[in-house]
Amino acid sequence: MDLTLLWVLLPLVTVAWGQYGDYGYSYHQYHDYSDDGWVNLNRQGFSYQCPHGQVVVAVRSIFNKKEGSDRQWNYACMPTPQSLGEPTECWWEEINRAGMEWYQTCSNNGLVAGFQSRYFESVLDREWQFYCCRYSKRCPYSCWLTTEYPGHYGEEMDMISYNYDYYMRGATTTFSAVERDRQWKFIMCRMTDYDCEFANV
């Protein structure tokens, strides 16, 4: 690579990823983007879990109308900051049915640490489950919804959380019966740095 180009790009990369510095860990990037890098093939089920003590911080997907109007998926995880502690329990949430819109957050104030999905040829759509982890008795606050991903049905999707102190707690999706595709809005929340008494927020 030309050294001039490297010196131009290096400060940009440093600024973009420097926001993760408070974690005290390096950012665990996506798997390889090649065909072998996706967690699933089209029309195939999958189960993806972050390593213990990490949560999902990025979601990438491409749509293929010829392959059952399905998507291939890729995720990136990052360790939670030491102030949050270790996860005290993890579980799979209830299934969100294929062919329907849905809204779900992790119960018990959990954070999203994985996804599980199965494809249904009959509706050209997937059912979804979140893998959630709870961190002691920490509670979410200052929650908000991201913009829609993808921006339009059928487009590539690339969501990265650049706010290091916000965590994914769930999502809401629309479903187009015409396009056989979904748009996602992810639910992002901050977490208290102390234990609280709320069972679920």
From Swiss-Prot:
Sites where Pyrrolidone carboxylic acid occurs are at Q19
UniProt main location, coarse: secreted
UniProt cross-references to Pfam families, sorted A to Z: DERM
Which compartments does it reside in?
Secreted, Extracellular space, Extracellular matrix
What are the disulphide bonds in this sequence? Answer: C50-C77, C90-C132, C106-C133, C139-C196, C143-C189
Q: Which family does it belong to?
A: Belongs to the dermatopontin family.
Region 3 X 6 AA tandem repeats of D-R-[EQ]-W-[NQK]-[FY]: what ranges?
70-186
**Which residues, renumbered to this chain, carry the PTM Sulfotyrosine?**
Y23, Y162, Y164, Y166, Y167, Y194
Q: Which PANTHER family match?
A: DERMATOPONTIN, DERMATOPONTIN-RELATED
Q: Name one GO biological process term.
A: negative regulation of cell population proliferation
Does the keyword field hold Transmembrane? Answer: no
Give the start-end ranges of region 2 X 53-55 AA tandem repeats: 26-135
Biological role stated in the UniProt entry: Seems to mediate adhesion by cell surface integrin binding. May serve as a communication link between the dermal fibroblast cell surface and its extracellular matrix environment. Enhances TGFB1 activity. Inhibits cell proliferation. Accelerates collagen fibril formation, and stabilizes collagen fibrils against low-temperature dissociation.
The molecule here is called Dermatopontin
Modifications made to the protein after synthesis? Sulfated on tyrosine residue(s).
On tissue specificity, the annotation reads: Expressed in skeletal muscle, heart, pancreas, skin and cultured fibroblasts.
Q: Which organism is it from?
A: Bos taurus (Bovine)
A GO cellular component annotated for this chain's UniProt record is: extracellular region
